[in-house]
Amino acid sequence: MIFKFLSKNFYISFSIVALIYFLDRLSKIYVIQLDKNNLGSDIFNSTYLNIVLIWNKGIAFGLLSFNESYLYNIISLIIAIIIIVLIIMSLKNQGFKRYSLLMIVGGALGNLHDRIFFNAVPDFIDFHIGNFH
């Protein structure tokens, strides 16, 4: 059986990525459902934290938002390449750095899933101090 040659570290690493991916999907599904129930209004507001569903069609913080599908596909391809690079980096590191990279991979896979199936990434956590978001 091929799996008997895989190391304990592989199983731990895979489990971390799968857990973060699962939590990412679960939290987004939950917030999307809350948004539907609230008819699109703010889900939660406080002094420093708001939960508001926004569909991000760009990259980080909504940068480079656009409607051209070929540009969107190029960004998705770049994200896939970055995920591969992060996996390779995690294999070459140990301890906290390795696990941090694996958690980033899990979240990035969740975002890639959203880009493929929804053409946007649902963002909902808004930390702020006063008017600075």
Where in this protein do the model-derived segments appear?
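Alpha-helical transmembrane bundles and membrane-interface segments of multipass inner-membrane proteins
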Residues: 1-133
